[in-house]
Amino acid sequence: MADHWNKLTRPSSIKVVGGKEPCVMELVIEPLESGFALTLGNALRRVMMSSLRGFAVYGIEIEGASHELTALSGVREDVADLVLNLSMLRVKLLNSNQRVLRLVARGPGEVTAASIVDSADHVVLNKDLHICTLGKDVDFCMKIYVNSGKGYVPATEYRAASRSGGASEVGSGFIATNALYSPVKKVALKIESSRIGQFTDYDRLMLTVETDGSVAPDDAVAVAAKILQDQLQSFISFDEVEETRKSVDKEEGVLPYDHNLLRKVDELELSVRSHNCLKNDNITYIGDLVQRTESDMLRTPNFGRKSLNEINEVLASMNLHLGMKVPNWPPESIENLSKQYSED
């Protein structure tokens, strides 16, 4: 059964190309089996646009305003305009999932998101956002309610929650707003042909991702991939490594492990930097290495995306990959087993 996935080509290279804006990035993934670029690209795009958690304004509170159609003295815009403007406010909360921000300003002049009172608990990502325009000597103060969530939540839900007492820290003048939580603004796919040796019937997937700045584009892709992995795991009714071991035993005979798992990483043709990173992280055998995730590896000092691509390519050549589960690892007498495999 393991041949169903072991015989497929896995991506050996993931290149990250930064754009002119820090919130825009292109990822180039290759090689992929024919048709897989569209399959994986669409799945990643849908998850990124719908299921990643972010932060959004879900309500405001202004003294003297009881509903969206209230006209404010000395303010050019009415409350409905303020609500519309604040729906585009992008904030990142650092130490909590819910917070009340305060905006204080005095006219005359334009009021932007830069007037939101600074705090160590949040970061305003678009401080140049226009909020309202004040007349001369007009004092303006507003509470802005921000929380975390996913997708889109209409104002009616928060309005109902505030009336029933289900929304915490909400005052009597609370005005609910529509909340759009997705930190990903745009995902574009481009698919080209890729080559392995003389064969050109492989896919290259290019993902252009734009976020609001609360999450890096490459992290958004990684989180989306993890969500898909977790959701699809429920469909797997067998042990991946056990099936791989059975396949190896069938082909090679008696030994209980894929011989590659018992090889030492020193045998791999890696750069000096990659070798040193593995050594410093006490990774001795390939069996140790494959159980690490990409996130684990990227947290290793001096280990970057280039080293990660190099290791992915080497493992793919052995039909292995990072993030595998190897039960009962390490085996007893691993040194003897390793020698036995090397002798075979």
From Swiss-Prot:
GO CC, one annotated term: cytoplasm
Protein keywords: DNA-directed RNA polymerase, Nucleotidyltransferase, Transcription, Transferase
EC number(s) per entry: 2.7.7.6
An example molecular function term from Gene Ontology annotations: DNA-directed RNA polymerase activity
Functional summary from the UniProt entry: DNA-dependent RNA polymerase catalyzes the transcription of DNA into RNA using the four ribonucleoside triphosphates as substrates.
Membership in a protein family: Belongs to the RNA polymerase alpha chain family.
Protein's recorded name: DNA-directed RNA polymerase subunit alpha
